[in-house]
Amino acid sequence: MRHLGLLRRRKVAVAAVFVLGAGLLAGGGVVATNALGQPSVDARVNALLAKMTTDEKLEQMQLLADWQATPAEAQKGIGGVFSQTDPATINALQHEAVEHSRLHIPILFAFDTIHGFRTVFPIPLGEASSFDPSVAQTDATIGARETAATGIKQVYSPMVDLSHEPRWGRIAEGSGEDPYLGSVMAAARVHGDQGSDYSAADKVVASVKHFAAYGAPEGGREYNTTDMSTERLFNMYLPPYKAAIDAGAATAMCSFNAINGVPGCANQETETNILKQDWGFDGFIESDYTAVAELRTCPPVNPDNGPCGHGIAADGPDAAAAAINGGTDMEMVSTNYVDFGKQLLAEHKITMPQINDAVRRILRVKFRAGLFEHPYVDPSQAAAAQLLPDAVAAERSAASKSMVLLKNDNSTLPLDPNKSVAVIGPLGDDQHDMLGPWWGTGQDQDAVSLYSGIKAQDPNTTFTKACDLPNTEPPDYNPANDCPNTSFPDAVAAAKSADQVVLALGETREMSGEATSRSNLDLPGNQQELINEIAATGKPFTVVLFNGRPLTLTNVAAKSPAILEAWFPGVQAGNATADVLFGKVNPGGKLPVSFPVNVGQVPIFYNHEPTGRPCDVGVKWDSRYRDLTTCDPFYSFGYGLSYTTFNVSNLQLSSATMSPNGSVTATADVTNTGSRTGDEVVQLYIHDPTASIEQPVRRLRAFERVTLAPGQTKTVSFKLTSNDVGFYDNFGKFIVEPGQIDVYVGDSSKATMTKSFTAQ
């Protein structure tokens, strides 16, 4: 599975660390230096590595959770600690490592800053809806600043797992179903996290995850097996990871899932051959939580009650050997490396060059991060760096940019601020759930509820909860307790008393994220019944959805005149949503993932491959569902409405042919034909109609979000090269085949305006 082309290796410049740690190069010898005559990072790494005992090397390969990290462990020289967020404790543990371990190697502290640290931004799936990489980069920039101020120098982000599975809860953490959009957003997050030099005081080390194809679990069930072809892996799932690596991501996290029978954290093909060798990645790979231990076979009676299950290792030593041989450099939580590493060396099941390579990678990142020069943080400044006004303002803008208007019949929106509003629903005055899954250190009180945001813009606003969505977890969770209908009469009365109604519906944050797979994608509980009863009042109403995945909205749309997809918007949820509802912000987001008509269509995605019998619901022997009148999703990838209207026209190609090293530029005009200033996302797709292996019916290759005043026209330009029209074959080789390439430009994946050129 070697490959070139779109996923080809690219060297990333990393700023040298200029201050030499005391005594690290003692012992003489010629040392490589940089242009200023100072020791290079690799020279410092090699000098330090030469002093280390086997035990010290294995300790560097150990990553502990906050609850495991003690002063004694720090003195042993552990490599990393995650989820500790108290700066005083971080300093204390760092002091033990730097002052009281033999070689004074600092600890790399890490945290899951997925969409914000204290200033929680929209979930990444929501930010992908902005089709604006600056939104993701700003989120990461502010998250890095707040995280680093606490003494944490690594973030387990970006999460770039492409997914076609709305049943899978972690779809909330990625950028949806498209490899190109996912790649653009992945690179933007890395740039925000690391900047040009991640040793800077306000920057952190990015860790791209979960490598690889974690977003394709069978049945959409968390942690489940992934099975896919080579061409699907290379064309669809790997590009966002590669984009993050090309952007400079210094570390990576391997995945829980098995890929074609080999677990991600013991997978030599993905970890060593692809990531390290083919892509030239010189950082380190950490395992996910107990993923090394989970390689073990579960015994009939599990006396230590430890993690196990994959069954490719008989015991702890076997698991450690499998992970090290696969390419996992650092073990999270479980301790098989430090417990059995020396035994495995003696038994020749692993080698010292493998250990040295892993430790060299870990030390390289620590030196580049400036930890040897600046291991400590000022606790008095940590709190002052959180929730700053510029961060809150940026979050409000990001949240409104990430919202998608799905329906707006009869100009139900924008709301009239001079008329009364009834906010109704279980999420209407909610703060907790607005932060979404992986809320960092965000606090419920940080968040602005929808009711508060609307009332700030229209004082004549009331709130009626109507029902509860309990934040309970299995085994205590019972779907029958979701949104009971006993208080619906109060909601109906409130609706009848108001001029306009806003229904705040969706999921709790506990229903989304890790370990939250759902078999049903309808609104939980009796929320649809609530919609039906409000619809029966005849009052104009809008459904605002707070959720972390695509939902089945067929019945919702049948009853609702307006639907706004707000996702989990973050700390400024209420204010940002009110900005959109009242028209202060014209919604311009587009869906980064398809919304199915029915859960039985899943997985459904726009860039699917064709069949010999394309769907025709009127023909029995075509690829269709007997009980559906369409093969399309309910809402397609790239879809989204506005309070104004746009027209995309005049598609032109600069050439009728593309030479092997040449390019073709596509231009199109986009005009605001309505009465309000607004944003349109112009999208370019291609199709290769005749190829040696089937090609997707559409592939997104470019997009641009533009702001236009009424009547204004702008010409957008997209440059296509062979990298855009080629593909990976069944052997993982990137090829560009001569022949026709169809270009489509429009406002969604259903674009119809088309021209063609010939690739030579």
Regions found by a protein language model. Give the residues of each.
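Hydrophobic membrane-insertion alpha-helices, especially the h-region
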Residues: 19-25
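Short proline/glycine-enriched turn/loop segments at secondary-structure junctions
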Residues: 731-733
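N-terminal export and membrane-targeting signals
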Residues: 1-19
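C-terminal effector modules
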Residues: 754-755
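Glycoside hydrolase catalytic-domain context in secreted enzymes
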Residues: 3-4, 8, 25-726, 735-749, ...
